[in-house]
Amino acid sequence: MGFPKEGEKVQIHSYKHNGSIHRMWKETTILKGTQSLVIGANDRTVVTESDGRTWITREPAICYFHENYWFNVIGMLREEGVYYYCNLSSPFAYDSEALKYIDYDLDIKVYPDMTYTLLDEDEYEKHSQIMQYPPVIDTILKRNVAQLTQWIHQRKGPFAPDFVDMWYERYLMYRN
């Protein structure tokens, strides 16, 4: 597996455990790309859902992917502050087509005051049975929910003060 280069524009593909496509982001600019970490940014990019419907993101977003964690984090810059959407997912993979991961349903929404809500537990339970997630996946995801909430409390990684703003400033260099 290679890794995307700084300044490169890539697609992001989200899959379900059974291999079906879940969602695709048309264009994300790579701000940092290494074997273990990818930070990207997009703004008003086209998103295609599994049923073919499309929509356009409303605000600039900084995306954080790490090979050692079963989650990715999207920091969205809004007038009221930075909102985060955290997907519990497999670690990322990258090939010539796109940056890819498996979405495992659970999400954490983090508000500008760093309060958060765990979302889609019912969807996780349903898909866990339908797609027969192995027990090890449940164990890994629970451990990563704990890791993610610890990072939120500690303002670590993508939740660190100024993380999103710093990477957004870098993104602006590629847009102009």
UniProtKB/Swiss-Prot annotation:
Belongs to the Ntdp family. Has nucleoside phosphatase activity towards nucleoside triphosphates and nucleoside diphosphates. Mg(2+) 1 binds at N87, D103, D107. InterPro entries: DUF402 (IPR007295), FomD-like_sf (IPR035930), Ntdp-like (IPR050212), SA1684 (IPR016882). Its cofactor is Mg(2+). Mg(2+) 2 binds at D105, D107, D120, E123. HAMAP family: Ntdp. It catalyses: a ribonucleoside 5'-triphosphate + H2O = a ribonucleoside 5'-diphosphate + phosphate + H(+); a ribonucleoside 5'-diphosphate + H2O = a ribonucleoside 5'-phosphate + phosphate + H(+). Its EC number is 3.6.1.15, 3.6.1.6. The active site is at R23. The keyword Transferase does not apply. GO terms for molecular function: magnesium ion binding; nucleoside diphosphate phosphatase activity; ribonucleoside triphosphate phosphatase activity. Keywords: Hydrolase, Magnesium, Metal-binding. Pfam families: DUF402. This is Nucleoside triphosphate/diphosphate phosphatase.
